[in-house]
Each structure stands twice: as structure tokens, then as C-alpha cells.
Amino acid sequence: MALTRLLLPISILWFCFYSSHTILQKDPLLICVNGDPGFDQRAYPTYFGPILDEFSSIMGFEPSILSLERFNPVGGPETSPDTDISVDDFGARGDGTDDTKAFEKAWKDACSSGSVLIVPENKNYLLKQITFSGPCKSDLRVKIRGTIEASSDQSDWVGHNRKRWIEFEDISNLTLEGGGTSNGNGETWWDSSCKRKKSLPCKSAPTALTFRSCKNLIVSDLSIKDSQKMHLSFDKCQDVIASNLMVTAPEHSPNTDGIHITGTQRIHVMNSVIGTGDDCISIESGSKMVIATNITCGPGHGISIGSLGDRNSEAHVSGVLVDGGNLFDTTNGLRIKTWQGGSGSAKNIKFQNIVMHNVTNPIIIDQYYCDSKDPCPEQESAVKVSNVAYMNIRGTSASEVAVKFDCSKSSPCQGYIVGNINLVGNGGKETTMSCSNIVQGLLREGLSTFLFMKRRVHECSY
């Protein structure tokens, strides 16, 4: 049963990529052409051919690439012994006193022995900044059943890494689960943020849970709330499943991204509810083969790729699929954001089967993103955005412009499919689509294809 339960997410992960690729190959506008007899995909073979080839190169890989090593019965790593240890066995009290040392001792034992590490239920464990490092002896399972809390006193962070609260690094074959809660007690950090009080200097604040350079990782069935800054970060990880997560913070808590993905390859975020003061999911440079399915988002800033290219940096993101979800009262829906002056690419991206509920900017590409106190200067270079598809997206927009593509003049967007988009204003008001600086064609020739509210759109300019 345990093996079956663990294999299920892998099967779902492969199915999502395979089914998306198969449908796109057969007819990328299959849903939206119903009721639009004037549109015939076959009339645009030079357009669809290259974009399908590009998507195939990302989505057409073998299933074995997505298999976590721990599930490979031949030559796989040693399995963990059936032994449980509790942090209480190492002196943790769970009564609000500092349990950091006890957790460090418990981790050292579990990492060296392969035992299952338990954080007992019905207790509140106070932790200061802590890093759980590998490599470990074998597969490792951590079950958080109780509550882990951060100190709300910022003086406790003196001499520690202010950018991270709980960090897991250089670990392979780790499962973190259990139904418990991580509470960052972030209120004091939010109150001292320059985003909330413009007169204050901007200082770093901790991310609640960071996974850095981890491989074959499962994070599931956890509640993560009120982080000091970002809630959950995957940094330079490979082969990750994040499922059944509840991530929450108040709407006006600054920089509290729900799930942050950077430099990470082959990750599937699924069946999760995220509502924070910033992006529900943010995908940044170095990330490839990212899937997000069945996501409930709101409040927050939506699901974002970026920001990319800040401080004239080079950034690359490719192979992103967002499939299925609901966004409630977010400031943005599906967003790609890049800074002027950057370089690199964001490509082979597909958003589909999303429902918007009173979302201010349901679909937006902003290549003039500027999150700065001072105006950002005009710059020539830009991150190249190409091969992007938006399919079967409906619901209500809080603004008249429901779809906005504000692409770079110097590096225009290239290769777009927008189909079966049905976004109306509150009360059924009609919405519009705005786009600028999109190349009329994909890579070589042909027409970019836009179907908005079941109508062909021709007014995109370049």
C-alpha cells in the first residue's frame, strides 16, 4: 500500500505531461474552435508546426525521466529501517521553550540511521534558525504532526542567517509530511518591512521552509502559515513533488510568496491551497519542467513566472505547465514579468483550464516590470518571451482589460496561442484584450493566433 501511494503522484505527473502534449499535437485549439466556423487550424500550418515542435521537445520525454530514484526497484537506494524516533527523545519539550538543540540532535541521529523522525502532535515546538544538512545514510522520512513555531523576537536572529528559518540542504530521498503546521509568526517582520512603511530601510527577512540542492523530494500534507517572508522555497532541487499543502498569510503581508521555485528541475506542485500577500507560486531563473495542477490561489498576486532579468541579469525558464485551478480576488492571474535590461529566455509555457474569480489582471505579460522606489530607466535588452499558450481560461475580471501583453520593443514576444478565453467583467460586462510588440509569426513566418471571447483578434501591434 505504501509503495502504491508513493507511486501515484509519479503516475499523475507523467499523465499530466503526456496528456497535455498529446492534446496539443492533435489540435491546440480543439476546445475553442467550437462555434467558430470561420477558423480552420489547417490554414495556418507554418504557425502551428514550429510551436508544436517546441512543445514536443519539452513535453515529449520518456516517463523514466520523471521517476524518482527511490521508487526504482532495481539498484535503488537502501530503504529506511522501520524505526521511529521522536524529537522528544532528544530533549524537546514542545511547551514554547527553545527546542532548537533537541531538533539538531534528533536530525543527526535520523540522518545517520535512516529512522523515521517524528514531531509529535498537540505540541508547539519553538525553533530558532536551523539547518538540516545531508547527505544522509538512506531514504529519510520526517513526520511533522504537531506545530513548529518561529520566534517572533527579531533579536533571536542576531548572528544567524536572516534569509532562512528552517533549511534542508544536500539531501536525497527525503519525504516531509505529517499533517502538522509551520508557523512563522511573521507579524513583527511585516510591520518592519519597507514595503509596508516606506520610511524604513529594506532588510532581509527569513523564508520559512527552504529546500536547497535536494533530490528526489516529497513535501506533502502540511500547513505553512504566516511566514516572515516567502513560505516555501525550492532552490536548485531536482525531482520534487509538493502536494496537499495549505499555505496562508494575510492579504497585506509583504513578500510572502506561497511557493517559490528557482533553479529547480522536474517539480510538480499539486492539489494545494495558497493564499498570501504575494505570488501564490513564483517560478524564477534556472527552472525547467515545472508543473502546477489543481491549485487554489487567493488572496495574492497570482501565479507568476518571474520576475526575470533584474539588475541586468541573465535568466532562463522553460517547460512550464499550469493545468487546472481557481484564482480568487488576486491582483494578477497568470503573469510573466521581466525587467528591462535583462537577457535570456522564458519559453515553452502553457496555461490551461483555469477559472478566474474577480481577478484584476487575469492574463498579463509585463516586460516593463519595476518593483522599485525609483522609476526604472529605459533599457534596450530584455528577456525573450516565446512559445506561450493560454487555453480554456474563463471567469470574471475586475478590470476592463482582461488580457494584456505588454512585450518588449527591443525583444518582442514570439509564438503565441490564445484560445477559448472567456473572461467577463462583474455583472457580465464585456472585457477587452490589449497587446503590443508581438512578432506576427513564430520563428519564421505565419500568423500569431488569438481567439478571445470566441472572436479572432487582429489588433495586436508590432
UniProtKB/Swiss-Prot annotation:
MF annotations from Gene Ontology: polygalacturonase activity
Residues glycosylated per entry: N173, N294, N358
Keywords: Cell wall, Cell wall biogenesis/degradation, Disulfide bond, Fruit ripening, Glycoprotein, Glycosidase, Hydrolase, Repeat, Secreted, Signal
Primary subcellular site in the record, as a coarse category: secreted
One Pfam family cited in the UniProt record for this chain: Glyco_hydro_28
Family: Belongs to the glycosyl hydrolase 28 family.
Domain of life of the organism encoding this protein: Eukaryota
Organism lineage string: Eukaryota, Viridiplantae, Streptophyta, Embryophyta, Tracheophyta
GO cellular component, one term: extracellular region
Protein species of origin: Persea americana
Descriptive protein name: Polygalacturonase
Extent of the signal sequence: 1-22
Disulfide bonds: C280-C297, C407-C413, C435-C460
EC number: 3.2.1.15
One GO biological process term: carbohydrate metabolic process
InterPro entries: Glyco_hydro_28 (IPR000743), Pectin_lyas_fold (IPR012334), Pectin_lyase_fold/virulence (IPR011050)
Reactions the enzyme catalyzes: (1,4-alpha-D-galacturonosyl)n+m + H2O = (1,4-alpha-D-galacturonosyl)n + (1,4-alpha-D-galacturonosyl)m
PANTHER family referenced in this protein's UniProt entry, alphabetically: PTHR31375
Active site positions, chain numbering: D278, H301
Function: Acts in concert with the pectinesterase, in the ripening process. Is involved in cell wall metabolism, specifically in polyuronide degradation.
